Every structure is written in C-alpha cells, then in structure tokens.
Amino acid sequence: MKEFKPGAAQALFFSTTAFAVSFAVWGLVAALAPTFTETYGLSAKAKSLMIAIPVLLGSLGRLPAGMLADRFGGRKAFSIFLLLSAIPAAAIGLSDSYAQLLWLGVFIGMAGTSFAIGVSFTARWFTPDQQGTALGIYGMGNIGQSIAVFGAPVLAIYFGSWRTVFFVFAAVSVLWGVMFYLFAHDATTTVKPRTFSEDIRVLRRSPLAWVLSLFYFSTFGGFVALAIYLPTLLKDNFKLTAADAGLRTAGFVLLATLMRPVGGMLADRHGGARILIGVFLALSLLGALMGCPWMPTFTVGALGAAAALGLGNGAVFKLVPEYFPKETGTVTGLVGAFGGLGGFFPPLVLGVLRDATGRYTLGFVFLSLFALGCLAVNYFVFLRRLRISQLSPAAFGA
C-alpha cells in the first residue's frame, strides 16, 4: 500500500470524529426511548414510530447531501450540516409532548445525512488501494451511536433531566461544526463538479449503484435497526433495566464499529464481493439464533451479527469509490439512503409483530431470508462474472 498523501491523516481524523458527533446526535431519540415511553405512556407501535422517524430523514437526505458534497466540497457541507443538526437537538430539549417529539425527530434526522458527505470528503484523499481501509476507519464514526446509547441515559441520571442531554449534544455539534470548518480541508482535485442532471443520469444508467444500495440496505440497515431497537427489545424480551440494556447495546455498536475497518482492509486485499459472500451467509444463520427466546443464544447471535454487519459495511464502501470514483458522493448518497431505510423499516416491523404475536421471532426470520437473497444477488452480479472474465466498472456501465 502506498504512503498517504500529505494531509490525508488529518482529513481522516476530522471526518471520522465529525461523523461520530453526527451519529451521536442522530441516535439520541432512540437512546432515550425507554424514558420517553414512560413519560408519554407509549405503545410498542408508537415507540417504534418515534425511533424510526429520525432514521427516515437521515436516510432520504443522504442523496442530496452527497450531491452537495460533490459540488461544493465536504468541508463546507459537513460544517453546515453539523451546525444545522444542533437546532432540532436543542429544540427537543424544550419539547413537552409526543407530537412535538415526532416532528422534531424528523429534523434531527439531518444529522444522519452527513454520512454521505464524509465518504465523499474522505475518499478523495486516498488512492483506490487505500480507500477500503480509509473508509473503514471513517466508518468507525458509528461509535457515536454507542456514545448516545450508553452515554445519554447516564448523563440524564447525572443531570437529573433528559432535556439537558439534548442541550449538551447540541453544543458539541456546534463546536465540532466550527472546528471542522477551521481545520479540515478538501483534497485538491481536477474533477469538474457535475450538474444535477448528470448526477441523476449516473444513477439511472448504473445498475451497480442499485445493487450496492441493496447490499447496504442489508448491512448498514441491519446495524442501525439493531442499534436503535436493542434497548427496547432487551427490556421487553429479557426484562433488563434501561442501563443494562444500554450497556449491552453499546457493546453491540462497538463491536460492529471495530469490525468495519477490518472489512475495508479485507476488501482491499481480497475484494469486497468475496467478503460479502461470507457476511450474508453468516447473517442468514445468526438471524435464526437471534430469533430464539433464550438470552445466551440471543447474545451469541447478536454479537455475531454485529461482527458480520461491521465487516459488510466496510466491504460495501470499498466498492463504491472503486466503481464510481468521479461520482462518489452521489452514489454514496443513494447507497447510504438505502442503508438508512434499512434501519427505518425493521423497527416498525418489529413493533407491529411484537404487538400482534407477543414476540420478535418472525422479524429475525425475515432478516435471515433477506440475507440469503443478497447472497444470491452477490453471486450472480459479482462472483459469477469474476469467474467468466475480469470484472471491470465498464461491465456495469459505471
């Protein structure tokens, strides 16, 4: 592997920490869901909707966020999004009803859109053989979710109010938005910014972008869904306290986060598609374990899924800049949007199934079946063609 460009390490540090701050703000509502449930007397479906809504905007907003990063640069875009995300976070601290929480939850989802900005910003600092590792390290910003899940309940107890927690995280978001603007810099590039119509044309004519979106729907969507819903699931299914459930969820997030750069490094060495074969096969088996109602079996399944999802996230984002070097932000926006949507629907489905059957088992059966479907798509789109001929971006019209 070649030496990094001068300034690349600094850029990676600032993008990763900014992503962690954004992800922490994005995850606050889910982290404090047990508190809101008790405060407002929510049903399982109402609680699931509250958890899922921030994920929706955080998903759909990634496509335009990625386009903005490609056009105006990640430095400006990331700084602005960090500053704007602080507004709904602070407003939730002032809210006093479930309805207000839902509306503000839509806007706090803005923090989740910054993921696409960071991928575009980071990828431009590294050569193709470094991008899997670099984006895997950037993806460790997922630890922001762990900070929210574990830190928010602890801070709420320390301050004696959940409202103060939102004010604290809003202040951190503002601080890091200013820091990013002052000290982070865009990589020098000769690539001419693309127009909106050109961005849309890339998405329409590149089926590979949609295949990668499907894969990220499974890997990152699975990660987000479990990260935001585990506190509720553990409390409902296994009668854990909010603090214990938060600690276990933080462990899940931490493991998935640490495995993401490993997935990127393995993808640099062996190819992202080959790594994804193992990931999807593992998820199909681990989903079955998580459907079991016994704590030890569930724990093995959840920790195994954390490792597999982390590896998968790193592998997918090795493939994005590899096949779309000029449109990384735009394609990342699409792929990231699907990944976020993969985190939006499962909590809703789990809530409905819990109310209908009294269990979450059927939801994990769906996870296993979906992973098997992705396994088949990966084989026919990537590996089968690799056996026939050397795969190149031109094979997909990229």
Regions found by a protein language model. Give the residues of each.
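Juxtamembrane intracellular "pre-TM" segments in multi-pass secondary transporters
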Residues: 1-6, 185-213, 396-398
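Extracytoplasmic gate region of multi-pass secondary transporters
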Residues: 29-33, 207-261
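Helix-breaking motifs and short loop linkers at transmembrane-helix boundaries and internal kinks
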Residues: 41, 73, 94-99, 127, ...
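Conserved MFS/SLC helix-loop-helix module at the cytosolic interface between two early adjacent transmembrane helices
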Residues: 60-98, 267-270
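Cytoplasmic helix-loop-helix junction between adjacent transmembrane helices
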Residues: 104-141
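Glycine-rich segments within core transmembrane alpha-helices of 12-TM secondary carriers
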Residues: 132-150, 336-346
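Helix-loop-helix hairpin linking two adjacent transmembrane segments in secondary transporters
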Residues: 137-184
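C-terminal transmembrane helical hairpin of 12-TM major facilitator-type secondary transporters
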Residues: 270-316
